[in-house]
Every structure is written in C-alpha cells, then in structure tokens.
UniProtKB/Swiss-Prot annotation:
GO terms for biological process: chaperone cofactor-dependent protein refolding. PROSITE patterns: CHAPERONINS_CPN10. Together with the chaperonin GroEL, plays an essential role in assisting protein folding. The GroEL-GroES system forms a nano-cage that allows encapsulation of the non-native substrate proteins and provides a physical environment optimized to promote and accelerate protein folding. GroES binds to the apical surface of the GroEL ring, thereby capping the opening of the GroEL channel. Belongs to the GroES chaperonin family. Keywords: Chaperone, Cytoplasm. Pfam families: Cpn10 (PF00166). CDD domains: cpn10 (cd00320). This is Co-chaperonin GroES.
Length: 95
C-alpha cells in the first residue's frame, strides 16, 4: 500500500530501539518505550499560508528525525508501524 501525506503532514517510520541494555540485560517488549526517532518516508506538498502560497517542508524523504513522544497518528503499512504527523511535531533532523 502506498500513502501520500497531504499539506504539512509527514509519514515517518519508527526506528527500533536496542533490544538489550549496556549491561547486557534484554528488554522485553512490554517494558520498552516507543522510540521517538524515525526516518521520513514521504512528505506532503507543504502548508498553504494566509496569502494562498504553499510553503515547502524543511524535511524530505530519507531524513532521520526526532519527534514528540505522543506525536502523530499510528498507521500500519505492509505490516510495519508508521506515524503520520504534522511537520511541527518534528523536533530536529539528525545529521
């Protein structure tokens, strides 16, 4: 299935966290926090301003980003968890 975000929305695939701690202990799925780091899969065309002009987004497909813990709406595409969120919910682009 293909999903194309609208306006200032961004489709992000969560990046998985480590399965074990630095001390070698394995973390069960029930104890893991959902990661707030992901990779941008697709972006919308941008937000329409009051003047009617569309402003392009700062993020692009392939960017690795940090986002708010409770950002976006969860969707499952081809069995993989993704989030659809507004660009303003993205805190930073990781270089």
């Amino acid at each position: 299935m293909k999903l194309k975000p609208l306006n200032d929305r961004v489709l992000v695939k969560r990046l998985e966290t480590e399965e074990k701690t630095a001390g070698g202990l394995y973390i069960p799925d029930t104890a893991k926090e959902k990661p707030s780091k992901g990779q941008v899969v697709a972006v919308g065309p941008g937000k329409v301003g009051d003047n009617g002009e569309r402003t392009a987004l700062a993020v692009k497909a392939g960017d690795e980003v940090l986002f708010n813990k409770y950002a976006g709406t969860e969707v499952k595409l081809d069995g993989v968890d993704h989030l659809v969120m507004r660009e303003e919910d993205i805190l930073a682009i990781i270089d």
